[in-house]
From Swiss-Prot:
The active site is at C397. It comes from Neurospora crassa (strain ATCC 24698 / 74-OR23-1A / CBS 708.71 / DSM 1257 / FGSC 987). GO terms for biological process: Mo-molybdopterin cofactor biosynthetic process; molybdopterin cofactor metabolic process. HAMAP family: MOCOS. It catalyses: Mo-molybdopterin + L-cysteine + AH2 = thio-Mo-molybdopterin + L-alanine + A + H2O. This is Molybdenum cofactor sulfurase.
Length: 937
């Protein structure tokens, strides 16, 4: 073993030397997704560019000198590619295709045209592209390894009454792209012998998916008698470039393709169209009949260069296989050795042990915390991305392998689908089981440092090296000690355009709240012209530099770009759109495009103005259009609903001033409320709010309606506390001292920032474009309620809130109320909000909202992942929405009912109004400085 380590350390040292020069794109990155594709070296691209600039390559279907040069080079490269796999051109032909999947489709296209069709057998570890073949077969069956061995021993996977003339196609991977498990190449020879047996009347063909195997190991086709009939592979998995694949066909079975019906340009000698329909396929080499249209000339030329450079840099494929195998063993043992403080394994590994079973250089696994709860795949990938680690997570296009490894029965997979699971979504744990895996795969240019750094990454963020803290014993506290903290609204921020900068509501201004959220919040979005996807800062961080201003005097949304536009002379630095819903501003509905927000399809109103759309496209450098999703929409694509819900960790963290028994027995509901007099609308509100549409009798009978939202991700309103932000910054200073600047509250993009200290709003707004409030709303300070000694607000205490009550001191008027003006005792309205659950975070919090660039050290997400991860997900802040009238929780005792204008009863008494969503004639408003009182779960 010592000499083996020395040998591989020598290879590793060689790779380290060339990586800086040959793979500059790998600087500061740990690339561990070679099973997807491998990086290409710089010298390959340089030499290919030289080939293209010094030679003239023409269409090989012509007779010119340039065309003949192309034909000659293609013939030479085809032979060289066969020799790369030790395939004798006398026994094999190679057909150039786009990728392995295209090769599979070519085989299936021929098999389905056979007079009897074909039956299909495939291994459960097959790639999705092999699984899809079953849809073209007369019948199909999926077998695991034991069942394949039984079949090869004589048992037939099909009924005896099947057509004896119908051939069977057996497909399997040489190496699983999911867990790296390798399957015997001898299966092909066994199938061949069985097919030739006198007792077997059915011809069986073999299709080998070698794409995963050849990426790091040699494939030997020197024995044509035992080789598979068809082999498919992708060259980019070996060399990184070009994007090209191959179908290698054993010439003995090439007659299968005689039944293929389709023909393309260059594959026929004669075609008759008029009066008769007849054609004569080329009768020379098989590839001449199968390579439809013009070949990808330049990609084939690049393949020649790629084989040269690969051999120069890494030597033989046997040498690559030895190195990657060594790294795979190191990776497997490193992950296997990680344990929590309670001795539970950190990683559940699905790949075979490379020390005892032949497997490829990849490891498939999932991560559990010390309590055995699965860590979210999406959270792992988010954190890996921040650390410059490139891995693959999810189903990895291997449904059978995933189902087998994770113990997912068909009914469970169908149930997951019905519950909303889709490929590429964040629903990675359903029904207590993961829906995918983490895949780490190695390649020729991988190093020991790559492996060690990844193992250290898992250890640092997911290995719990201290025993879990046991919950405190149950104790019942004296009711007099159950005080709630008094909080204040420190700031109110609306984000008119989804994922762009926020508009800070000036002090002294009342801001309307509707069931769908703060008025004007996330009513617009930018939509990619091609994909229809709503743009997000996660992909386009420069969106943070688009600064909105709501100018109610002019009735405009003004957007200024705070970045550099010097490269676009003549481009204005700002643009304006009217707040009114002027139909002339929008593109005709027939050309309106649908969009997707958080996986949901919506039908926004897109703006027709080229000036508006060009402004956003230019400053962001992405083709996009401005679209609006106003409240009040009806029908498919016009409504969205909140998805936030209480998380399990919120039920497990009692408020410090509430006993465990009290917390568990108190229902998480709010007391009822009645409508307050309608407020003066300052600032103006958009029309057609959801509050203006009453529920139908059918809806009322079905119970509370789901909460409607506009373009926010999960809920109407997002809130954070300054106390939690301060605590997080203290944690960052402790865990990541290299970060010199504290994290701003702005990175969390909250609508409400709550603070235990009252703000000191100025007498008038600092924004001259915002209307000045009336004297009655600015001169009268918010009255402070009489209360018992204040309870200190602890960091992250918001996780334990069931509801919030906000005391607003605005002036209200209503013809139906005697309380048309504030009373001398200090008229206040109380607005109730229900807490909808903790906010799950992604690495978008790592974008500096001032500069549009990434924050230092991947903060705050890196520290959040260490201090705020529950059940594998990272949380910070809380979702909330207006309390519905039917959501009563009996928490009135937590809010004092003394004669202070802040009573939480029925609203009777001195100058008290209690409001919730949907009240007729009421308008809910909040302002900076309002008093906030929480109730607890």
């Amino acid at each position: 073993m010592g000499s083996l380590n020395i040998q591989h350390n020598g290879y590793d040292a060689d790779v380290e030397k060339i990586r800086e020069e040959e793979y500059p794109m790998l600087k500061d990155s740990i690339y561990l997704d070679h099973a997807g594709t491998t990086p290409y070296p710089k010298s390959l691209m340089d030499r290919f560019a030289q080939e293209m600039t010094t030679n003239l390559f023409g269409n090989p279907h012509s007779a010119s000198a340039s065309s003949q040069l192309s034909t000659q080079r293609i013939q030479d490269i085809r032979l060289r590619a066969l020799q790369f796999f030790n395939a004798d051109p006398a026994d094999f032909d190679l057909v150039f295709v786009a990728n392995a999947t295209a090769g599979i489709k070519l085989v299936v296209e021929a098999m389905r045209c056979l007079p009897t069709g074909f039956d299909y057998v495939y291994h459960q570890s097959s790639h999705t592209s092999l699984v899809g073949v079953r849809e073209e077969a007369r019948s199909s069956v999926c077998l695991d390894t034991r069942q394949v061995e039984d079949w090869l021993s004589g048992s037939c996977p099909f009924d005896d009454n099947e057509d004896e003339e119908r051939p069977i196609l057996f497909a399997y991977p040489a190496q699983s792209n999911m867990d790296g498990r390798r399957f015997p190449l001898s299966w092909s020879s066994q199938i061949c012998r069985q097919s030739l047996s006198p007792t077997n009347k059915r011809k069986t063909y073999t299709l080998l998916d070698a794409a995963a195997l050849v990426s790091s190991s040699p494939l030997d086709l020197s024995n044509a008698e035992t080789a598979p009939d068809f082999v498919v592979l992708s060259f980019y998995k070996i060399f990184g470039f070009p994007d090209l694949g191959a179908l290698i066909v054993r010439k003995e079975v090439q007659d299968v393709f005689l039944s293929r019906r389709y023909f393309g340009g260059g594959t026929v000698d004669m075609v008759v169209c008029l009066k008769e329909q007849w054609h004569a396929p080329k009768d020379g080499f098989l590839h001449e009949r199968l390579e439809d249209g013009t070949l990808p000339i330049h990609s084939i030329i690049a393949l020649d260069v790629a084989m040269d450079v690969h051999a120069k840099l890494f030597g033989s494929m046997e040498r690559v296989a030895g190195h990657t195998g060594f790294l795979a063993r190191r990776l497997y043992q490193g992950l296997k050795g990680l344990r929590h403080a309670n001795d539970e394994l950190v990683c559940a590994i699905y790949s075979p042990d490379p020390e005892t079973e032949e497997s490829g250089p990849l490891v498939a696994f999932n991560i559990r915390n010390a309590q055995g709860i699965w860590i979210s795949l999406a959270e792992v990938e988010k954190l890996a991305t921040l650390k410059g680690i490139h891995i693959r997570t999810g189903g990895v296009c291997n449904p059978g392998g995933i189902a087998s490894a994770l113990g997912l029965e068909p009914w469970e997979m169908k149930q997951n689908f019905s519950s909303g699971f889709r490929c590429g979504t964040d629903n990675d744990t359903m029904g207590g089981k993961p829906t995918g895996i983490i895949r780490v795969s190695l390649g020729a240019m991988s190093t020991i440092a790559d492996v060690d750094r990844f193992v250290q990454f898992v250890k640092e963020f997911y290995c719990e090296d201290t025993p879990p803290i046991l919950p405190p014993p149950e104790t019942k506290l004296d009711p007099s000690l159950r005080n709630t903290p008094e909080l204040f609204i420190k700031s109110i921020v609306v984000y008119p355009i989804k994922s762009c900068a926020g508009f800070h509501v000036p002090p002294g201004i009342d801001w309307e709240v509707r069931p769908e959220g703060l008025v004007w919040d996330r009513e617009w979005c930018l939509v990619h012209r091609g994909s229809g996807q709503a743009l997000s800062q996660k992909r386009y961080p420069r969106m943070a530099l688009l600064r909105p201003n709501l100018d109610f005097t002019k009735g405009e949304l003004q957007v200024t770009f705070a970045g550099d536009i010097s490269s676009s002379p003549g481009l204005p630095s700002s643009i304006s759109v009217p707040l009114s819903k002027n139909p002339k501003m929008y593109a005709p509905k027939k050309s309106g495009m649908s969009s997707r927000v958080c996986g949901e399809e919506i039908t926004p109103q897109t703006y027709a103005s080229a000036q508006i759309n060009d402004f956003f496209s230019t400053v962001l450098g992405v083709p996009c259009v401005l679209a609006r999703f106003p409240p009040g929409g009806q029908g498919k694509g016009m409504t969205r609903h909140a998805k936030a819900h209480l998380q399990r960790h919120q039920h497990q963290q009692p408020h410090p001033a509430v006993s465990v028994s009290t917390r568990l027995t108190k229902p998480a509901m709010m007391p009822g409320a009645f409508p307050s007099p309608k407020a003066v609308e300052t600032p103006p509100s958009p029309p057609d709010s959801d509050t203006e549409r009453s529920a139908t009798p059918t809806q009322e009978a079905q119970g509370p309606k789901p909460r409607r939202i506009l373009l926010s991700n999960e809920s109407p309103i997002l809130a954070i506390t300054s106390t939690s932000v301060d605590a997080l910054n203290q944690s960052i200073a402790l865990l990541n001292p290299s970060v010199s600047q504290p994290i701003s509250e702005a990175v969390f993009r909250a609508n409400l920032v709550l603070s235990p200290s009252p703000s000191t709003p100025s007498a008038s707004p600092s924004n001259p474009l915002t209307p000045s409030p009336s004297p009655s709303t600015t001169s009268k300070p918010t009255p402070k309620p009489k209360q018992k000694p204040k309870q200190k607000l602890n960091p992250y205490e918001e996780d334990t809130w069931s509801s919030l009550t906000i005391f607003n001191s605005s002036s209200f008027s209503s013809s139906s109320s005697s309380c048309s003006t504030p009373s001398s005792s200090g008229f206040q309205t109380t607005t109730k909000f229900q807490m909808l659950g903790s906010c799950r975070r992604c690495h978008m919090v790592c974008i500096d909202q001032t500069t549009g660039s990434k924050t230092a050290g991947g903060e705050p997400f890196v520290t959040l992942s260490k201090t705020r991860r529950f059940e594998g997900k990272v949380f910070f802040g809380v979702h909330m929405g207006l309390q519905a009238e039917d959501e009563e929780d009996g928490h009135a005792e937590d809010i004092e009912k003394e004669g202070t204008g802040m009573g939480m009863g029925t609203g009777t008494g001195t100058g008290t109004g209690t409001r919730s969503m949907g009240g007729n004639g009421s308008v809910v408003k909040v302002r900076v400085g309002d008093v906030v009182r929480p109730s607890y779960l």
